Regions:
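Extreme N-terminus of proteins, especially the signal/transit-peptide cleavage junction
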Residues: 1-3, 194
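Catalytic-core environment of secreted peptidases
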Residues: 3-20, 74
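Active-site-proximal helix/loop segments of hydrolytic enzymes
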Residues: 3-4, 26-188
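Glycine- and acidic-residue-enriched helix-capping/strand-helix junction motifs
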Residues: 16-30
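Short, flexible active-site loop motifs that bind/organize anionic cofactors or intermediates
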Residues: 18, 51, 152, 205, ...
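Short, solvent-exposed alpha-helical surface patches in non-cytosolic proteins
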Residues: 188-236
Length: 236
């Protein structure tokens, strides 16, 4: 029987999560989708809490996870508070959850992000975080970057960089499950922008007075390039 993994993509819909140099809910989703795709390519069954921008309350995440009965679960988040680096939270009881957190941490360091460590947090009911406390399988919360630290946010300021985090999470999961994969640690190459697309980007950016960061957010969406080209024609 194939292994199963549940992936939570934190926040969504009206809940943007942390917002500064990056919008957390959007980055979480790109990372989670990349993690899903890498796992399914290696024969792992995956269920996600969301695969688009929609409401995703934590109690519903936990319910869906337990109904799926996976071998492992991760909840993909990004941080705020002015810190720097990746961190992962696992249960105060240790076990496979601790192993999963440590395996993911090792892979994240390989893509160039520093780590604040693998941690636990005690609450009045045991584990502080519901995703770790109330899920029935070993579960880990991944905090990729600090969105309010410009230098740290730059570690995940393009879709390719965000996808690299997702693949790193997937490799850590596969390590924990004992499933082999390509050991290459190369970061995904940034796609080249052709002359026509670049001209459209410049035209729309100048006409609308948009910042480079805003344009990048637009281009990172699934149909962003096509939309920019249509907007460029509209302002001619």
């Amino acid at each position: 029987m194939s292994k199963k993994v549940f992936i939570g993509a934190g926040h969504g819909g009206s809940d943007s999560g942390a917002v500064d140099y990056l919008v957390e809910k959007d980055v979480n989703l790109v990372m989670a989708l990349a993690c899903r795709d890498y796992l399914t390519a290696h024969g792992v069954g995956v269920r996600m809490s969301r695969a688009k921008d929609e409401e995703d309350p934590i109690n519903e995440e936990v319910r869906e996870c337990n109904a799926y009965n996976p071998d492992l679960a991760i909840d993909v988040h990004n941080n705020s508070g002015g810190g720097d680096g990746f961190e992962a939270y696992y249960t105060i009881n240790g076990g496979t959850g601790k192993t999963l957190a440590q395996n993911i941490e090792k892979q994240v360091v390989k893509i160039g992000q520093n780590s604040r460590g693998c941690k636990t947090r005690q609450g009045q009911r045991g584990d502080y975080y519901a995703f770790v406390r109330d899920t029935k399988c070993p579960a880990v919360i991944c905090e990729g970057v600090f969105v309010d630290n410009k230098a740290d946010a730059a570690q995940a300021d393009t879709k390719a960089k965000q996808q690299a985090f997702g693949v790193a999470y997937a490799k850590g999961i596969l390590d924990t499950l004992g499933i082999k994969y390509d050991t290459s640690t190369a970061k995904p190459a940034e796609p080249e922008t052709d002359a026509e697309t670049q001209a459209a980007i410049t035209k729309v950016q100048q006409a609308a007075g948009l910042s480079g960061k805003t344009m990048q957010y637009l281009l990172d969406y699934e149909y962003g390039v096509e939309l920019v080209k249509k907007l460029a024609k509209a302002v001619e």
